[in-house]
């Protein structure tokens, strides 16, 4: 029988795989551009939450897990386990997408200055993570949590995708970057932006003392 830690790790691997597979596929092949990407990520994160959220919490995102540590819902040891699972799921999803569909190996340069991308990622991730921290403890929302999180993610991608790419997720940026030449050179921008936004969201949530009932 699988231990709780293994079950949680597998759930995060599976959920992150679904999210990155759907989002990366839409980004590479969908004709509708940003709208298709937003819907792919938003709908998939909602499905993932309903599918395995009861096992691991349905993070699928190291930034979300980082915020959960700050809020006291996850230990640092659990955080490390979650992140390994999330990065593994993202990398495997990228492997599948690139093997099946193929893609250019040339990385597109940042469309704007790095600090602009970081600023957008901080703000977008802040809103996303704060929403998750809040709704995940609102018992009256019940089964609507997945829909709210998915809708929020889709809306934020539409809002910032044209500027920063709207990653909001270090794992989501990591997987595809492994298979695109020179893309890892810009990875730090997304890691810094998303983790900073998540940390600020968690600190704000704790400072405000948002009620859990």
Please report, for each region that a protein language model flagged, where it lies by residue.
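Membrane-interface helix-loop junctions and terminal tails of multi-pass membrane proteins
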Residues: 1-213
């Amino acid at each position: 029988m699988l231990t709780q830690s293994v079950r949680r790790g597998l759930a995060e691997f599976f959920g992150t795989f679904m999210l990155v597979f759907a989002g990366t596929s839409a980004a590479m092949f969908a004709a509708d551009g940003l709208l298709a990407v937003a819907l792919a990520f938003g709908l998939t994160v909602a499905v993932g939450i309903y599918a395995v959220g009861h096992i691991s919490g349905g993070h699928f995102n190291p930034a979300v897990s980082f915020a959960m540590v700050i809020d006291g819902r996850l230990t640092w040891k659990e955080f490390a386990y979650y992140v390994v699972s999330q990065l593994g799921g993202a990398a495997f999803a990228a492997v599948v997408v690139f093997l099946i569909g193929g893609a250019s190996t040339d990385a597109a340069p940042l469309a704007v200055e790095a600090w602009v991308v970081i600023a957008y990622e901080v703000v977008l991730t802040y809103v996303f993570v704060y929403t998750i921290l809040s709704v995940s403890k609102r018992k009256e929302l019940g089964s609507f949590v997945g829909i709210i999180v998915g809708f929020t993610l889709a809306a934020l991608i539409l809002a910032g995708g044209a500027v920063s790419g709207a990653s909001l997720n270090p794992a989501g940026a990591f997987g595809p970057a492994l298979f695109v030449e020179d893309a890892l050179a810009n990875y730090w921008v997304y890691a810094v932006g998303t983790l900073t936004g998540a940390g600020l969201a968690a600190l704000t949530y704790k400072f405000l003392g948002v009620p859990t009932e």
